[in-house]
Regions:
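Phosphate-binding loop/pocket of nucleotide- and phosphate-handling active sites
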Residues: 158-205
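Short beta-strand segments
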Residues: 22-25, 56, 81-83, 174-178
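Short glycine/serine/threonine-rich phosphate/pyrophosphate-binding segments
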Residues: 56-67, 89, 152-160
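Active-site/ligand-binding loops adjacent to catalytic centers
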Residues: 1, 5, 11, 18, ...
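Surface-exposed amphipathic alpha-helices with a cationic face
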Residues: 67-74, 164
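Active-site/ligand-binding-proximal alpha/beta "capping" segment
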Residues: 15-58, 66-68, 120-124, 128-147
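Structural signature of the thiamine diphosphate
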Residues: 2-24, 148-151, 155-172
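Short acidic, glycine/serine/threonine-rich loops at helix termini
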Residues: 32-36, 64-69, 90-94, 185-189
Length: 205
């Protein structure tokens, strides 16, 4: 990200056509997009009967935009961050300290800093999700539902399960399914890799 920003600055002086740097982590057009689209879609598809929303943070745009919209509609909706082990955001939400603990094979989510997008999120609490909790979710969905989802989805769904248990029966919990499993073939479906990491392995691998 820093290299991209520096390159954009360098090109501004030499490119007559101008330069566009999306800067998805700190450009709050990201969270605004989710405030204007994803949040309303969730509200509409649940007929406004959503009790909790939980998801991870990469850029922070999704959880910031969705949480801002849902909290405007109903301040009692619970918003939780689902954070992979090794990320600093769980401790930031729960303890006010940017401190990562553990590690994860999950890619693309979690962070060691608070992005401009994430800073706008309206979050009630956070869950720290280890691989031993998220991977079985992924494997179960492949085997039982025919859904081939990636590691970010595993973290999100594991968080949704936790929030469901926390809020109790009869609640509507929403999360985001944001990646496919084929992006992680060398990890998710590699028995040797999983054995070396001491991670859960389904019988069918």
């Amino acid at each position: 990200v820093k290299v991209a920003g520096r390159l954009a600055d360098e090109l501004k002086s030499s490119n007559n056509h101008g330069v566009v740097w999306a800067n998805q982590f700190d450009n709050t057009a990201n969270s605004k997009g989710h405030y204007e689209t994803t949040g309303p879609e969730i509200w509409m598809q649940t007929d406004g009967k959503v009790d909790g929303f939980v998801c991870s943070s990469g850029t922070g745009g999704t959880i910031a935009g969705v949480s801002s919209f849902l909290k405007e509609k109903n301040k009692n909706i619970k918003i939780y961050l689902s954070d992979p082990a090794g990320s600093s955001l769980y401790n930031y939400i729960e303890n006010g300290e940017l401190k990562g603990e553990g590690n994860s094979i999950t890619e693309g989510i979690g962070s060691s800093r608070v992005t401009a997008n994430f800073a706008e999120a309206k979050i009630d609490g956070a869950f720290s999700i280890e691989d031993k909790e998220s991977l079985p979710v992924i494997y179960d969905l492949i085997q039982n539902e025919g859904l081939s989802l990636g590691t970010s989805c595993g973290v999100n769904i594991a968080g949704a399960i936790r929030l469901g248990k926390k809020l109790g029966p009869g609640k509507t919990i929403v999360t985001i399914l944001c990646d496919r499993s084929d992006k992680y073939n060398s990890k998710l479906f590699n028995r040797k890799f999983l054995e070396e990491k001491g991670l859960p392995i389904p019988a069918w691998i």
